[in-house]
Amino acid sequence: PKYDALVVAGPDSTFSDRDKLLLDQYLMNGGNLLWLIDPLATDLDSLRNAQQTLATTRETGLFDLLFHHGARLNRDLVLDAQCAPIVLNAGPMGNQRNMQMFSWYFAPVVLAGPEAHPICANLDPVHFDFVSSIDPVNDIAGRKSQVLLESSTRSILYNAPVRVASAVVNLPPEHFETNRIQGHPLAVLLEGRFESFYAARLNAQLRDDPDFAFRESTPSGRMIVMADADFIRNDTRPVEGGIAPLPLGWDRASQRVIYDNKEWLLNAISYLLDDAAQISLRSRSIAFRPLDDTRIRGQESSWIMMAIGSPVLLVLGFGLLLSALRKRRWTQN
């Protein structure tokens, strides 16, 4: 294909069969895909104005295509006790607003484990907004799947339609106490053999048309599927004359970049392009070797005396050496 990788980010309308066929054949011909799909649509304007909204299924027409290729996008929202903060008005306090920080359970914060895939290795936490869960499905010979990111074990699922309200911050911590050993998958890597979604759906005339060059499978393809298009969306701030984008990974509560969404995205693209060198460079870790505090305290006096006395002894020794050399020279004369 003309392009080595393709990013499908946040579609808000339904894909036609023609578009789906083109994407399917792009994969069959050696292309690689990064999918960032929102299974549910959340009206943020209603949430800001009315403090609540309803998240409903967003029909993109891609659910069956992705299911066939190994990823089921679930029509739910993940609420996680390990989440980003949000600043809300907690009620009047005199004549001023009482702005306080709360846990925003609709925004999971995920840190990959020590045995993480190279895409996630040595990265700081990443941040999601209204993310859905994904299930790896339809395993076939020659294709493997791997969960790249998952929620914490203290996470729960709300199935669509989901009432999204600011009052969710009042949920007690006990609400998230589960017996789960693992979290819910949020990003999945699929690589290896893929079979065309349209192998048994196209009519024989079109499938066998040499000008169309239909391919039924590929032995080595790569796909990354994530159920949150906001993962790569820059936040914005108002400026004179309009709005300006903030860096990807910006946290409004702390007013700085603390999430590694950008590095994760770059690593994902590099992996799809089979550029391991770039991933290694971005994921390079620096090992800090802390000093032994106990040993420092025990030898503190010795080191102080050495630091002060060494220069004095060095000067005295140099002076004695010069004096001896001068005396020797005059004695010989």
In which residue ranges do the predicted regions lie?
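Acidic, S/T/G-rich, low-cysteine, solvent-exposed domains in lumenal/extracellular/periplasmic regions
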Residues: P1-A277
